[in-house]
Amino acid sequence: MRSPRGGAAAQPSGRRGDTTAAAAGDLVTTQVSLGGFDAGVAAGDLADFLEHEVGLVWRCRVKTSWTPPDSYPDFALPTAPASASAAAAPPRYDRVPPHAFVHFARPEGARRAADLAGETRLILRGKPLRVASAPDSSLRVSRRSSIAPFRFPDVRLEVGALPSPGAFLAAWRGPDAGLDLSVDPFDGCCRLVFTRDTAFTFPGFREVAAIRCDVKLEFPVRDVLEVRLYRLDCSLLLRLAAAPLVHYRTADDDFHEPVPFDLLDDDDPWIRTTDITPSGAIGRCGVYRISFSARFWPKMDRALDYMRERRVAIVDCGGGWGPRRGLTVRDELEFGEPMQDVFFCLQHAEGLKFPLLFMVNALVHKGIINQHQLTPEFFSLLGRSEENVNVAALRDFWGDKFPVFDACGRLKKALNRVARNPKLLCSKVGDDHAEVRRLVITPTRAYCLPPEVERSNRVLRHYHEVADRFLRVTFMDEGMQVLNNNVLNSFTAPIVKDLMSNFFQQKTTVYKRVRMLLTEGFHMCGRKYSFLAFSSNQLRDKSAWFFAEDRKTTVEAIRKWMGRFTSKNVAKHAARMGQCFSSTYATVTMRPDEVDESFDDVVHNEYIFSDGIGKITPDLALEVAERLQLTDNPPSAYQIRFAGFKGVIAVWQGHGDGTRLFLRPSMRKFESNHLVLEVVSWTKFQPGFLNRQIIILLSSLNVPDSIFWQMQETMLSNLNNILSDRDVAFEVLTTSCADDGNTAALMLSAGFEPRTEPHLKAMLLAIRSAQLQDLLEKARIFVPKGRWLMGCLDELGVLEQGQCFIRATVPSLNSYFVKHGSRFSSTDKNTEVILGTVVIAKNPCLHPGDVRILEAVDVPELHHLVDCLVFPQKGERPHANEASGSDLDGDLYFVTWDEKLIPPGKKSWNPMDYSPPEAKQLPRQVSQHDIIDFFLKNMISENLGRICNAHVVHADLSEYGAMDEKCIHLAELAATAVDFPKTGKLAIMPPHLKPKVYPDFMGKEDGQSYKSEKILGRLYRSIQEASNGDVVSQEVCTPNDLPYDIDLEVPGASDFLASAWQCKCSYDAQLSALLSQYRVRTEAELVTGHITFLVKNSSKKQGDIKDRLKTAYSALRKEFKSTFESIASDQCEIGDDEKNLLYEMKASAWYQVTYHPKWVEKSRGILGPDGEEIPASLSFAWIPVDYLARIKLRCHGKVRVEGQKPVERLAAYISERI
């Protein structure tokens, strides 16, 4: 019987233990691997021996091959027959010692084999056997026993594209026989597995070794977009969202498998590789045609039912039950020809410049069109219009969700749409923002991503004339998943390491591909791109900047302009260069005599208490606030970049000598002549939320679980009442949403009702949905008496050790009306000085000592520092350093003064020692080669996420929580991993700390999960139940349903209707483009920034994508707010009251063209790119929400001041002044 080669398979079990008990310590395995026997031992003989000595054997596989050291598989090369491999092999090809993978019927067999081998009592033909136990697998075995895969042997596979609905162009075919398909509900994956001879190349040798290998193509069922059935042909067409994962492992195996059922896969690792087809078909083609024997239709129908349950679209294209829609199958013209590019890319097209070529490639890479549709007619259409029109049309095209078969017809529609909406043309981006192109590179392919507007940086601002030559490249796994080190490292079975005295870690062909791209660069769209640099955040995301040189600007010239980097530690050198790529706002250009670059640091006990913080005078701080348009509420501190300095500058009075900026030596990172003060972030109201790490630590420090439960229940109750209770909705918006909820909060204050106002209702639902999702995935529980605050220093030295100062903003919307005239110009800050015991923490926080308990005191001299956590400069050690080893260069701290969250005893645990290891210095200057090696070293070793996840698991399994020895060890490893970008010291997690199973709240596959009985598990399941079947469906409002509020009509508005309609058409077109580009489901999610689901397109971190989306929408809203506020030159001198009336007329006009039935009917003529009716877009009307609030309140009459609720206070404030 042939063994299943595809991995996770079924296995019966004698008993099923309780999974929770198993997770807590009763983990077992039925697998072992053995070595030490002679090369002539057959699998059957070994199985017989083990059954006699140990116990019943269900499978035994003897293996005598492996991936030779220093070799790489090359699937494009021809091979000799496998029997000739030894003769053809280079001299360095040594065979691996024979070893075997054995499955016993019961766990006792595996344990007995390990015990006998450990006592040297398991002896075969005079040789003592060595035994290595496989990973604990009781949960997987238990789950596997009841879930069998749907297995289809000897299928035929073709990979290709659909140039039209009834035609399939094949780019590659699998072997004629021996290819198996499995659809496995066990782990939700589909696998295609076959065996082939494979050439392995060796550095310095022309000869190759031919080794027989199993090859596996694997993809999750969730990546199947559609299945088309052709019953008469006995075939399926699978359209995939992403390329499959490609694996191989050597297959010179001898099997003994007497049982008739499937088993779990052996502990013989599969090795990831790149595209195995010469033509790059796996990377560039997304359609898989699978043909099989007609006798398998009943089983196939059951497999398709399972896929249907997983929300895969199944389309029956005819057969015995209906008219046949046949499929024409033929080979593509270049069938089998080697692909010239490292990833498929259109390098040149007559008459097309780079911006257009890039967008055409983006369409092909996304699968909207395929390369066969790039016809002369298609390019001719692009040649007839201006470049900016074509780019806008292709961007509109890129927003499509489904493949397009008539590419020319769709392009014509897009060009017409742009012609009707000139605002879709790419407008000039402001100095603080830049359009950045991205390229995502996976093991088999690449994706060009359209330019996105994001915050600019020092380098892009200086080189703005060649800004389109910068490219952000991100290395990811297929399906936009994180590229973890399992993809880059070639692993062998643990028994092989035991048997080999000179074993060393190998790299995969994926690593080889990444290294080649970094060192040699690549060609794309007619340009040669070379590696430039990366920031610290990019390093963690496996991302870097590349640049396409021209005759004037080179990579070396850019590096020289950036500054003088003298550090001989590679990690620090790379981090300093990356500092220039921090996203910043350029503000004031300083004169050298205004800057003190040697302001003394505060140092005690060898600790720098002022590490990363300086001072800014009030007048300069106000100048910066003006540049950032923050004068309504000027910040107390800014996180900055200036020349070669980085850190925070807090507002303090100057010394009267003309110096306005005070920078400390601890802030200096490199030498630079750049004199623009650049701002990264600033202090502001940021609501406080718990997360899993903080909850684990507080729970371990004896904060009762009932506290977290009650806080979540309160939050859940508020979210459930958000539509029915105005007071609750207002509280949620103003206290937990920062600025994101301002529009909705103003609407509530003015008297608009969620029941009758669809845009308000949609925004509230979006916020509810996003906060529920955060509760489920992150345990992100709102803390009313909490904030995230920027760390600062008490420059006066009045705070004592153990003390801090906090003056926190209390949310208020009054400042929204400061532009409405002198009656609204009160800028008194609504703040609260916190007194008493507080808890602080900084992420990541894993050690019990990372939670610091301090005493907040009132110091009048510090009252100017708002939304800051002010630390003392006294004591044995900085409190910032005690909290996760942080400093004052911009770190944000979670702070709560809720007594229920303060651990009993009110004393901190001893903090961990965060002293960094000694930095390794090179004996020479750091080279570009060193920096690339460092980037690669991080890619194959970066495991902060794994360490943090392992900490969560062990804290959940242990009765001691975060106090468990394993957790303390993991906390130490995490500190090393966090500092890797600065020190270059790796954090290596030992095997015994790697989790075998995960608590259910971590959302792993069922076979890897157990039911957690600790607080995080209970919180998780509570939210699961609350949101089960919960339709957060953002009910899309159609034009037929749209209510019209006659209260918002004012005399004189008709004069502005025509211009309002033009603005609305332009706004809606740009809004629709944003929704399409980011695949955001609803307008309400976009405008509130509370987005429940985002398709990954360049980063594992959804937060990063959300930030870019917020930036893009903020720029759009700002543009139209500016349009609204622009008035004729002859009206500039009118008084506040007249100006406000004028704005109320315009606001009424903007409302009417959005909601009035006449204009709604007119909007019906505007269709989407595929002719579909676009849902009513309502956010345009509420850009001037402050003026619509005035109109509404005037209709209501004056609001009573006495006894008012929070939601009514703003209404009273406004009505008193109008």
Curated annotation (Swiss-Prot):
One of its GO terms (biological process) is regulatory ncRNA-mediated post-transcriptional gene silencing. Disruption phenotype: Lack of the shoot apical meristem (SAM) in the embryo, but formation of radicle and scutellum. In weak alleles, formation of an incomplete SAM and abnormal leaves production. One of its GO terms (cellular component) is nuclear RNA-directed RNA polymerase complex. It comes from the Eukaryota. GO terms for molecular function: RNA binding; RNA-directed RNA polymerase activity. Involved in the RNA silencing pathway. Probably required for the generation of small interfering RNAs (siRNAs). Regulates shoot apical meristem (SAM) initiation and maintenance and leaf polarization through the trans-acting siRNAS (ta-siRNAs) pathway which probably modulates the expression of the ARF2, ARF3, ARF4, ARF14 and ARF15 genes. Belongs to the RdRP family. This is Probable RNA-dependent RNA polymerase SHL2. The lineage of its organism: Eukaryota, Viridiplantae, Streptophyta, Embryophyta, Tracheophyta. The gene is SHL2.
